[in-house]
Amino acid sequence: MANSALASTSQAQVRPAVSQVKQVVQERTRRRADKAACIAIAEAAQALLVTLVSRAADEARRGGAARILPWHIGRAVQSAEFRSSPFFTKTTARAADGTSGSTAKEARRAARAARLDGHVKVNPFRSLVKRTARAHGNVALTAPLVVALSAFVLEAVNQVADTAGEAAAKSDATTITADHVRTAVTDLLAGDLQARALAAIGAALVAEAADE
């Protein structure tokens, strides 16, 4: 079940909208990102969300729960594949910690902090979280966790955008490209998470090129 839940995000046709990612990138980096870069950032963020939701759904099912609860997210984040990635070292201290708390108040606080940090007044990713839970976890989410996981997606977009912007700056590029995003993913993720995100990016860009 876990393998099917972790199917390609491109095949599932679920990912952050390119326009939403573009807005975040411009506000975070003050650099222009081409369409391929925005698609790549969206796919990387979605790959992380799918993995987190799928692992949390597995935890919920093992406990016989009908919904994903905060401690299911906490256990998922504490798994080895997450803890080995630099992205999760940062996120645990910022967005993900709120989802591993025991109260809805903590989850909302994490979501609010991530929104403010990203300079985005309204988190645009709530509907994405709900669709992802249906498509990959098939387990209901509590309302506070929808908020917190939306903050998680925003944090993923923020970190990938920031790191891709740094890669662009090092090469004196004025535009963030998909290659800069791949560099960011390589820096932020490790092991299967990295491989999954890079594969999703590659598949999405091939599909985009075929549609043009």
Task: Give, region by region, the residue ranges found by the protein language model.
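Histone-fold and other basic nucleic-acid-binding segments
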Residues: 1-212
